From Swiss-Prot:
Belongs to the MDM34 family. Its main location: mitochondrion. GO terms for molecular function: lipid binding. Lacks alpha-helical transmembrane segments, suggesting that it resides in the membrane via beta-sheet conformations similar to those predicted for other outer membrane proteins and porin. The SMP-LTD domain is a barrel-like domain that can bind various types of glycerophospholipids in its interior and mediate their transfer between two adjacent bilayers. It comes from Neosartorya fischeri (strain ATCC 1020 / DSM 3700 / CBS 544.65 / FGSC A1164 / JCM 1740 / NRRL 181 / WB 181). HAMAP family: Mdm34. The lineage of its organism: Eukaryota, Fungi, Dikarya, Ascomycota, Pezizomycotina. One of its GO terms (biological process) is mitochondrial genome maintenance. This is Mitochondrial distribution and morphology protein 34. Component of the ERMES/MDM complex, which serves as a molecular tether to connect the endoplasmic reticulum (ER) and mitochondria. Components of this complex are involved in the control of mitochondrial shape and protein biogenesis, and function in nonvesicular lipid trafficking between the ER and mitochondria. Mdm34 is required for the interaction of the ER-resident membrane protein mmm1 and the outer mitochondrial membrane-resident beta-barrel protein mdm10.
């Protein structure tokens, strides 16, 4: 079986060549070009020649009036030629530097200056040989698929034929590109051309698409502000209604570019905050200070004045576990600030000691255990030894509270930011230098109880009240250790009353006993009932403080929620 191909009509149709040139230009610029080619490759001339290819039928799979499918062996050695035009880079150093990373190559000043030269390439003397699968259909066009690489050789003529290196380089690069063209791009080009020739619907749709592209390419560009977002907001984040949007224009004085979506603004805000938290998905928590917000200068924030709980200082927070004075509530903090009479002593009680320091107080001194020793000393001195607590004794010639000299105690404080005690609490008592605490510290409570008891005794006649004695006995029975101490105190009082006349009047008392001694005009001693009540009250307070110390590591609000029981009633 033989076929006759009429090759002359393909050479006579001018529109066919124009369309083929456009398709070849698009195909050559579709794939990545080598760095030496700095411009688009344009097909300026195309000619299929007068010699047709030779086809040998190997297999026919389907044959009908409107379709055909078969396998051919094709060989071509004709006079077809193709002319291309582009621009190339003549400076190889510029091409080398563009294809290498900047940190690994030198940066010359003038040696790498680009130099582009126009290039014209003519491809001729094609020699093709390969197996072709051909499928023809009037509805689907022609499909040509090459089983193998059909390109054997071709001749490349260019402007740089006089330079052997450039000529060989162009020959190699163009051959590689043509192999890709025959295997991938040429079947698609032939298929589109066949559809344009035999399928009118495809031709009409292609013309409509061309008109649409030309219409879109002409005229002014689209205004991005012509269609505002769905949820527009102004520069301050306030939502805008439709009337406000219509009043805005490109010529108005209002900054129209600030009309952005609220969602986009939130994303930008999250991106801005990511440098503080190193994460875009960190949830925002109210009244929380992030560590990344602080700086090394935050250590001086504590000396800058009284800080309001509603405007905290941005500094790192340190939770000091086990320190009762490190967790003041707002009420005690405000009361201490309002009662403070010294303007130089300022502190910040917001949160967990904001600005108090960068490091925890695990290395600080341990809490001292204060023990009252009521045993009778073996020496001739009858005064009991007191270690960091208040023991209440009386003497026949005790000095007056108002006239007693103030002893000087050299004691260092544990907490450098502890505020001074309120002067309102010590109106009737001298301010004894001792460790000052917060509103829940123990020395303040002890002096308050003592001042109330002395005030009650001054108003009423000192007497032994059976009701008060019963309450005291009930309190002492609940705590055996306190009862032993109270019993020791009563025995000590009886012995001191018996030997009170022989005691010297110039005996110096400890500084912690001075606030609790009441001096009478006649020099008479304090009533024994008052001393017993004081000893019992101190024992009860020590028991409560021991209970609070055992719960120091518990939750903060649990300790404050425990209401203190009122002191026992005293007889008048």
């Amino acid at each position: 079986m033989a076929f006759n191909f009429n090759w002359s009509p393909l050479m006579a149709d001018a529109s066919f060549y124009t369309r083929a040139q456009d398709l070849l230009t698009a195909a050559l610029n579709k794939s990545p070009k080598p760095p030496i080619i700095v411009d688009d490759i344009i097909v300026t001339e195309l000619n299929l020649g007068s010699i047709p290819p030779e086809l040998e039928i190997l297999e026919i799979g389907d044959l009908a009036e409107d379709r055909f499918r078969g396998i051919f062996k094709m060989s071509y050695s004709g006079d077809a030629f193709l002319t291309l035009k582009t621009r190339v880079q003549a400076n190889p150093l510029n091409t080398y530097l563009l294809t290498r990373p900047s940190f690994a190559t030198p940066r010359p000043l003038a040696a790498a200056t680009p130099l582009t030269i126009p290039l014209q390439i003519t491809l001729s003397d094609f020699k093709l040989s390969g197996f072709v699968i051909l499928v023809f259909s009037k509805q689907k066009g022609i499909t040509v698929v090459f089983r193998n690489d059909p390109l054997e050789s071709l001749k490349v003529s260019s402007t740089f034929d006089s330079i052997p290196f450039v000529r060989d380089f162009l020959q190699k690069e163009i051959e590689a590109q043509l192999r890709i063209l025959f295997m991938d791009e040429l079947p698609a080009i032939i298929h589109r051309l066949s559809l344009r020739l035999w399928v009118p619907e495809y031709r009409a749709g292609e013309e409509l698409q061309t008109q649409t592209e030309s219409a879109n390419g002409e005229g002014p560009g689209q205004d991005p502000l012509a269609s505002p977002p769905q949820d527009p907001v102004d520069a301050l984040g306030n939502a805008l209604n439709e009337s406000e949007i219509e009043s805005l224009s490109l010529d108005s004085s209002v900054e129209t570019h600030s009309l952005f979506s609220q969602k986009n603004l939130l994303r930008l805000a999250a991106l801005t905050d990511s440098q503080r938290t190193l994460s875009l998905f960190t949830p925002s928590i109210r009244e929380v200070v992030y560590r990344a917000w602080t700086s090394p200068s935050d250590q001086t924030d504590a000396s800058g004045g009284v800080t309001s709980p509603f405007s905290p200082v941005l500094s790192r927070t340190q939770s000091q576990v086990g320190s009762m004075s490190s967790f003041p509530d707002s009420a005690s903090m405000v009361s201490n600030q309002s009662r403070s009479s010294t303007p130089s002593h300022t502190f910040s009680g917001y949160g967990l000691s904001l600005g108090a320091g960068r490091h925890s107080k695990a290395h600080a001194r341990k809490r001292k255990k204060r023990v009252v020793d009521l045993r009778r000393p073996k020496t001739t001195d009858d005064a009991p030894s007191v270690s960091d607590e208040s023991a209440f004794t009386e003497s026949t010639s005790t000095p007056s509270i108002c006239s007693a000299p103030m002893p000087v105690l050299d004691e260092q404080t544990d907490d450098p930011v502890t505020p001074p005690l309120s002067p309102d609490r010590d109106l009737h008592l001298p301010a004894i230098p001792e460790r000052h605490g917060m509103s829940i510290s123990r020395p303040a409570l002890r002096r308050e109880i003592a001042s109330e008891m002395i005030r009650d005794t001054a108003e009423s006649k000192p007497s032994s009240n059976p009701v008060g004695q019963a309450i005291q006995d009930e309190d002492l029975s609940a705590t055996p250790r306190a009862a032993v101490r109270a019993h020791g105190a009563s025995v000590l009082e009886k012995e001191k009353q018996a030997t009170g006349s022989s005691a010297g009047s110039s005996r110096q008392l400890p500084s912690t006993i001075l606030p609790f001694i009441n001096d009478s005009p006649t020099g008479r001693v304090v009533d024994q009932a008052l001393v017993e009540r004081l000893a019992g009250e101190i024992a009860r307070r020590m028991r409560d403080e021991k209970f609070l110390a055992s719960n120091a590591c518990g939750p903060f609000w649990d300790r404050h929620s425990q209401e203190e029981s009122p002191p026992p009633a005293y007889g008048h």
